[in-house]
A protein has these predicted regions:
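Transmembrane alpha-helices
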Residues: 97-153
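Membrane-interface helix-loop-helix junctions at transmembrane boundaries of multi-pass membrane enzymes
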Residues: 101-109, 146-159, 315-330
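Interfacial helix-loop-helix junctions of multi-pass membrane proteins
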Residues: 28-40, 127-133, 169-189, 240-254, ...
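Hydrophobic cores of alpha-helical transmembrane segments in multi-pass inner/ER membrane proteins
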Residues: 87-93, 133-145, 192-206, 306-312, ...
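N-terminal signal-anchor transmembrane alpha helix
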Residues: 10-37, 228-240
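Extracytosolic (periplasmic/ER-lumenal) interhelical loops and adjacent juxtamembrane/interface segments
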Residues: 31-78, 246-293
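A juxtamembrane structural motif centered on a specific transmembrane helix
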Residues: 204-218, 222, 367-396
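Membrane-interface helix-loop-helix junctions at boundaries between adjacent transmembrane segments
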Residues: 151-157, 171-194, 198-199, 205, ...
Length: 396
């Protein structure tokens, strides 16, 4: 049954909303070229906040001569980190509530967080190997707590969300220290979407009050496929953005529906999709030639067409199953996302539209996760256990 614990439901939805905000804000930081505005991690030029006063700026410039302070950008990156840290605390609270009835799993979560927490100052002290080992052990403990959990309630998903959030912190660190490596930046975007999807699932599972409806149950598998296809398309979108290939086909009428005025321009798929290019290269601005970037842009378009057709079919099936409002919302989101994507190309990637395009992908993910939740109905064992049941659960 859905939990009657209002504070828990409120916590779940606040965490979900903050995850969506972080996706949007992270896109803003990346697209405004502020991703490397704080060259160290988790501090910013060695400070908890960022240098503002002239003396502090001069000291920071001396310490990082290759990355002079740009105060109009540093605040964006560091406030993004603060928001991410806040989300981490909210997800930790969810995971602790989820595991409170089981001493073993609760202990695993606490041990994992302690190890990861110790790893951060170790990393700052340049003990990179020790920090990496501690983080890896912590992640393994969280994954064990999630995947070795018998049953499929919201509780294990809450723990899995915590594991993803902790790995997201590592990706955020590597984004800076590995100089915007495309596979890391793209992985960071996917991790953010995964976090949002998991938190949305948790929020729905502890809130939904619809009984199981056999009319919509058959949509579950189709919705799962829809989520997978959308995740693949989000990867292509992140790969396009992180390789600075959004405008590879030009700007204006010659950029869409054709590319550089051609239906099949010169493309280098091999170079465009080399996922790992080593460490030490500064990827800001992109390093690929025009043919490789064009290949990335065109594959993103092909993927968009395939996802659009499938998700529109899924919306039609949802409408036939009685979920008319949900079907209309999904179809409208698809049309909006396509319009935003075309506008990005034709108008030359305006910041507001580019950020909205990322937000549109997140809203599509939310719509699909909501559909998944509605196909399952009320979860019989998802609510908060009573105090009298906790001792028995703790023995498991």
């Amino acid at each position: 049954m859905p939990t009657t614990n209002l504070p828990l439901r409120t916590l779940a939805w606040i965490a979900c909303a903050l995850a969506f905000f972080l996706i949007m804000y992270g896109s803003f930081v990346r697209l405004s070229n502020a991703g490397l505005s704080c060259p160290d991690w988790p501090t910013c030029y060695g400070r908890i906040t960022w240098p503002v006063k002239p003396a502090a700026v001069a000291k920071a410039d001396k310490a990082f001569p290759n990355r002079p302070v740009e105060t109009h950008k540093t605040w964006r990156e560091q406030t993004h980190r603060f928001a991410a840290g806040t989300l981490g605390l909210l997800v930790l609270a969810e995971a602790l509530v989820a595991t409170f009835a089981s001493r073993r799993r609760f202990g695993l979560v606490i041990a994992a967080i302690v190890l990861i927490g110790i790893g951060i100052p170790m990393y700052m002290a340049k003990n990179y190997v020790t920090a990496s080992v501690l983080a890896a052990i912590g992640e393994a403990l969280l994954l064990a707590a999630a995947f070795l959990w018998r049953g499929s309630g919201w509780r294990r998903i809450a723990v899995l969300a915590l594991a993803v959030v902790c790995f997201q912190a590592l990706l955020g660190m590597w984004t800076v220290t590995w100089l915007l490596k495309p596979i890391v930046v793209t992985g960071h975007l996917l991790g953010g979407m995964a976090t949002f999807a998991l938190l949305a699932w948790v929020a729905w599972r502890i809130s939904i009050r619809e009984q199981f409806n056999p009319r919509v149950a058959h949509l579950f598998a189709a919705a799962v496929i829809g989520v997978v296809l959308l995740a693949c398309q989000i990867f292509l979108g992140g790969w396009t953005s992180s390789n600075y290939a959004a405008l590879a086909c030009g700007i204006g009428g010659s950029a869409f529906p054709t590319c550089l005025g051609q239906w099949w321009p010169a493309m280098d798929f091999h170079q465009g999709f080399i996922l790992w290019r080593g460490i030490g290269v500064d990827f800001q601005g992109g390093i690929l030639d025009a043919a490789a970037r064009t290949a990335i842009q065109m594959v993103h378009r092909f993927g968009a067409a395939a996802v659009f057709v499938y998700e529109l079919w899924l919306a039609h099936q949802a409408g036939r199953a009685g979920l008319r409002g949900h079907a209309i919302a999904l179809a409208l989101l698809l049309l909006l996302q396509v319009a935003l994507g075309i506008s990005n190309v034709v108008l030359g990637l305006p910041l507001a539209i580019a950020v909205a395009h990322t937000g549109g992908a997140a809203l599509l993910m939310f719509a699909l996760v909501t559909l998944l939740a509605r196909t399952r109905g009320i979860e019989g064992h998802s609510g908060m256990q009573t105090a009298s049941a906790m001792p028995a659960a703790a023995a498991r």
